[in-house]
Swiss-Prot record:
UniProt-listed CDD domains: Radical_SAM
Gene from which this protein is expressed: rlmN
Binding site for S-adenosyl-L-methionine: 157-158, 189, 211-213, 287
Protein name: Dual-specificity RNA methyltransferase RlmN
Disulfide links within the chain: 105-330
Length: 343
C-alpha cells in the first residue's frame, strides 16, 4: 500500500484518517501542531505520541518537506526561493520585507495556463497543479529561515484553477492548530475564474484580490484571454457577490501598461466599474521583461491615474516594484533561477 503524505490533509481530514487507524481524534491536533507549529519533519520528533503510535504512522504515512535549492537576494531585501519538487519540476516563492511585516508570495501551480500577455509566468505554460503539501511546504521552508506575517497566493499559477488543493492549504494556513495565520493576513489572487470565486468564498474566509488590468472587454480580451470566458460584467458581479467579513475589501489589481490601459479615460471607467464593490485598488506599473513588447507607464501617467482615483475617494496605492533585479517582481516568475541552477 502506498503511503499517504500527511501534509496533504486538512485537520478534519487528518482526524478522519486517525480515527480510521483506531486512534482518538484529538491525536490529529497534536500531529497538526507538531507539523506546523514545531516544524516536525519526522514522526519520531512527536514526543507526546506513544512510540508504538509513531511506528504505526510510519507504516502508512510520511511527512514531505521542501528545502530551498537556491536563494537569490535582491538589493531591496526581497528574496526568491527555488524549490525542486520530487518529480524534478521547480517552483519559486518570493519573500518581500516591508518595515514591520514580511509577505511571502507562494506558487500554486508549475507554470500557468491563463496566458496573460503581460505576465512572464504565462509563457511557461502549465505543467501541473501543486499538491496541498507542496503549497504549505513552501511556507514551512521559508519560516525556518525568516518570520512570515502575510501570505499571498500570487506566485506561479492561477490559484483558483487548483481550487481543491489551494483550499486545503488555506485551511491549514489559517487553522488555530496549524500555522495560525489570521484570515486577514492571507490573500488569494485570481485572474477571474468566476465560478471558482464563488466556491472559494463558500469554502474559506480569506482576502480576495482580482487581477482586473483593463476597463473594457476589448482590451481585457486582448491582454487576458480568460476575459473571453468570463467578461467584465460577470467578473464584477462575482466580486460584488463575494462574501466579505466586516471591514474587508476586495483588492483590485491593475497592472498599468503604457498606451494600453493607463489613460485618464481608463481611470474614469475604473471608478465607475468598481463603484458598488467594497474595494481598494493596487496600481502596479508594468515590469518590462524580455519577450514582451509592452512598456512600463511613465511616472506622469501613474501619478495622474493615482490622483484621479484619490480625488474620486477610491482607496488606492501604487505598488513599488520589488525584486525586479532578480526577476522576482510582479509578473516576472518564470524559473530564471531554476535555469541558472541547472546551468
Amino acid at each position: 500500500m502506498e503511503k499517504v503524505d500527511i501534509k496533504n490533509f486538512t485537520l478534519q481530514e487528518l482526524e478522519a484518517y486517525i480515527a480510521g487507524q483506531g486512534k482518538e481524534r484529538f491525536r490529529a491536533k497534536q500531529i497538526f501542531k507538531w507539523l506546523y507549529q514545531q516544524d516536525a519533519r519526522e514522526f519520531a520528533d512527536m514526543t507526546n505520541l506513544s512510540k508504538d503510535f509513531r511506528q504505526e504512522l510510519e507504516k502508512t504515512a510520511w511527512i514531505s518537506n521542501l528545502d530551498a535549492e537556491a536563494v537569490e537576494a535582491s538589493a531591496d531585501g526581497t528574496k526568491k526561493y527555488l524549490f525542486r519538487l520530487a518529480d524534478g519540476n521547480a517552483v519559486e516563492s518570493v519573500l518581500i520585507p516591508d518595515e514591520d511585516r514580511t509577505t511571502l508570495c507562494i506558487s500554486s501551480q508549475v507554470g500557468c495556463a491563463m496566458g496573460c500577455e503581460f505576465c512572464l509566468t504565462g509563457t511557461f505554460k502549465l505543467t501541473r497543479n501543486l499538491t496541498t503539501a507542496e503549497i504549505v511546504n513552501q511556507v514551512c521552508a521559508v519560516k525556518r529561515q525568516e518570520p512570515v506575517r502575510n501570505i499571498v497566493f500570487m506566485g506561479m499559477g492561477e490559484p483558483l484553477a487548483n481550487l481543491k488543493n489551494v483550499v486545503g492549504a488555506l485551511k491549514i494556513l489559517t487553522d488555530p492548530d496549524g500555522f495560525q495565520f489570521s484570515t486577514r493576513k492571507v490573500t488569494v489572487s485570481t485572474s477571474g475564474l468566476v465560478p471558482e470565486m464563488a466556491e472559494l468564498g463558500a469554502s474559506v474566509t480569506v482576502n480576495l484580490a482580482v487581477s482586473l488590468n483593463a476597463t473594457t472587454d476589448e482590451v481585457r480580451d486582448r491582454i487576458m484571454p480568460i476575459n473571453r470566458r468570463y467578461p467584465l460584467k460577470e467578473l464584477l458581479a462575482a466580486c460584488k457577490a463575494f462574501p466579505l467579513p466586516s471591514r474587508r475589501w476586495i483588492t483590485i489589481e491593475y497592472v498599468m501598461i503604457r498606451g494600453v490601459n493607463d489613460s485618464l479615460d481608463d481611470a474614469k471607467r475604473l471608478v465607475r466599474l468598481i463603484s458598488n464593490i467594497p474595494s481598494k485598488v493596487n496600481l502596479i506599473p508594468f515590469n518590462e521583461h524580455d519577450g514582451c513588447t509592452f512598456q512600463a507607464p511613465t511616472q506622469d501617467s501613474i501619478d495622474k491615474f493615482h490622483k484621479f482615483l484619490l480625488d474620486k475617494h477610491v482607496t488606492v496605492i501604487t505598488r513599488s516594484s520589488r525584486g525586479s533585479d532578480i526577476s522576482a517582481a510582479c509578473g516576472q516568475l518564470k524559473g530564471r533561477l531554476d535555469k541558472a541552477v541547472k546551468d
